[in-house]
Amino acid sequence: MGAVAGRTGGLTVRVADMGDPGVAPMLDGLAAEYTARYGHQAAERELTGTPDAAFSAPGGGVVLVEDGGRAVAGGAFLRKDARTAEFKRIWTDAARRRQGLGRRAMAALEGAAARRGYLRAHLTTGPEQPEAVAMYERLGYTLSSEEGTDPEGRRIYFAFAKDLAAPGERCADPGAGGHSGVRAGGASYD
C-alpha cells in the first residue's frame, strides 16, 4: 500500500507503485481512452512500452487521486535524467472530468517528483488529446518547438516541460483555485 500524500475535499491523494491494485482503474481507463482515440495497437504500445519497474522508487512513482478508495485521477513518473522526471499515464476518470481532478493529479505528480529531487518535469501527449494540451498549457507547461514535429515541421505529438517548485513551495491544496476545469474539443481532463 502506498503512502498517503494528503486529503482534500473528501479526496485522498497517495503515492503508490504500478503493482498496487488501486492503479487498475487508471490503467483500464487509459486503455479505453487510448484505444478510442488511437486504436488498439497504439494503446497497447503506449501502455506496455515502459516497464512497470521504471515507475518504482527511488526514481519513479504513481500518484492516485482517490474518492472512497477508488482512483478517479492519477498519473505516473519515471527518471528521464538526473534533473528531469517524465510524466506518463496521466488520467482522469471520464465520468469525473471538469471537477479539478486533473489539476490535483498534476500537482500531486509535481510534488512527488520534486520530493524525489527532480527539478523539471517533461511529458508528451498525442494529437488526439486537445483537452490535455490545453490543461498542460494552463498549468504553465511550455510546448517544445524542438520535439514532436516531423521533418516538414508538422506536429505529430506535443512535448511539454516545466520547472518544478521545491517541495516547501508546494500548494497545500492542489485543487484549490476556483477554476472550473480546462475545456477544449468538447472534453476535459481537469
Question: Which stretches of residues belong to each language-model region?
Answer:
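C-terminal "cap" of GNAT-fold acetyltransferases
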Residues: 18-19, 119-122, 126-190
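A short beta-loop-alpha structural element at the N-terminal edge
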Residues: 11-26
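Active-site rim helix/loop that mediates acceptor-substrate recognition in acyltransferases
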Residues: 36-64
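Alpha-helical interaction/dimerization surfaces of two-component signaling modules
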Residues: 30-33, 112, 135, 139
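Active-site beta-strand termini and strand-to-loop segments that position acidic
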Residues: 66-68, 162-163
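Conserved acetyl-CoA-binding loop-helix of GNAT-fold acetyltransferases
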Residues: 92, 98-111, 138
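Conserved beta-strand in the GNAT
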Residues: 62-64, 70-79, 86, 91
